């Protein structure tokens, strides 16, 4: 009796329900060729629970096709034929029992572009196509590029795994093929370059090179690739020192550099690495916590001194290690002459010559054009040479017969240059073995000739003044006419045991013995010229100048 009473109530509730067919799906979907796309979809249809429960089938069709005869693009009905071109690429992903009609489209092709509609069937009562809500699919050209993933930073000498993947791709459709190209790859194992994953052991020279991953779907003309530049971390492998843009030669982490004393020096230290190493210069060989003299790769010395000769070290510090190089700085100088000087001594003419240079120079004496080299002792000369540090000293003793005009020169040289000095001895001793007599006779002759010349000049001047006084009065200049007309030629500086100039003050007159040793290099007389009167009103007078000569 109770079921009969409830039956009208159930009928009343059923009569209030209205059959509803609804579909929620995107109206337009765009996908690149060869990629995948998921189209979310949900639907509803009128169904009463007291009906029988036949299976629920859903279908996706191309727009314009007749559902009863056309092949579907996707369905859950195993008895319906699916289009061969969409087989495996168009798939239903949702649970249709939960009214999920989501559609997965893989390996999209240009011919897939078009409109699609959804249909639901269940038993004899539910057969409905949702023509009002269609899906518009557009397939465009592939512009997506693969991604290259580095599982860890690239470090020189350490194996690193890489992977290549294409965003938006899926397993639907033919498989993807991969290929890797780049200078960092080993040509001995080509199989490793055909996988989506790659193990790479980079080298320092691989930094900055290109690595390319190319993807292609088998059986399709779809190809895409991406190229990346490798960023390889590596410690310094070599250090180069440049001077004026020219690299110095380095042997066994040591470089030798000669520098002229007083010259400016600028050195550049270069150590390629990634990231860049910290460069610094140290004096000598640096200890663990030594303080650098330069915190950059540049070392500047404004004026190189001999005290700076020695070692400098350039160090390149890097997180992966350090490297350093030793520079041996050698300060050199050209020969600098001190001398030569000559003097008469008991054993003969004694000449001395000194040179300073780095390295110490070699010395050579020349008598006229005849070289006198080394330490030797022969009949007419004796040479003695020595060196200490940058100094080289040599002495030359000449004895025996010497020519009247004697030229003695001293020359020094090292690998960087040479310098020489000479002494010209005029009217020297003709023969040291004959003693003082020849020298005295020669000196007396010179003094007699000088007195005659002075007397003749004095007579001519007195005669000229008398003629001027007779013609017109004039006042003579206070200057001594005789001293104004006599000039002495240049001569060499006297030797240490020789006297000073002949016109020395009376208080400094040299001893008689030294006066005997005096020799003139030359003596000349200039042409006499008449002097113009300075004061016309002065009375006519005659002036005499006293001439003093050493005896």
From Swiss-Prot:
Residues 19-136 form the Ig-like V-type domain. Residues 1-16 form the signal peptide. One of its GO terms (biological process) is cell adhesion. It is found in: Membrane. Residues 17-441 are extracellular. Residues 528-537 have a biased composition (Basic and acidic residues). Its main location: membrane. N-acetylneuraminate binds at residues 119, 127, 129. The chain crosses the membrane at residues 442-462. The keyword Signal applies. GO terms for cellular component: ficolin-1-rich granule membrane; plasma membrane; secretory granule membrane; tertiary granule membrane. A motif (ITIM motif) lies at residues 518-523. Residues 463-551 are cytoplasmic. A motif (SLAM-like motif) lies at residues 542-547. Residues 146-229, 236-330 form the Ig-like C2-type domain. Residues 189-210, 469-551 are annotated as: Disordered. Glycans are attached at residues 100, 210, 231, 253, 328, 375, 384, 393. Belongs to the immunoglobulin superfamily. SIGLEC (sialic acid binding Ig-like lectin) family. This is Sialic acid-binding Ig-like lectin 5. It comes from Homo sapiens (Human). The gene is SIGLEC5.
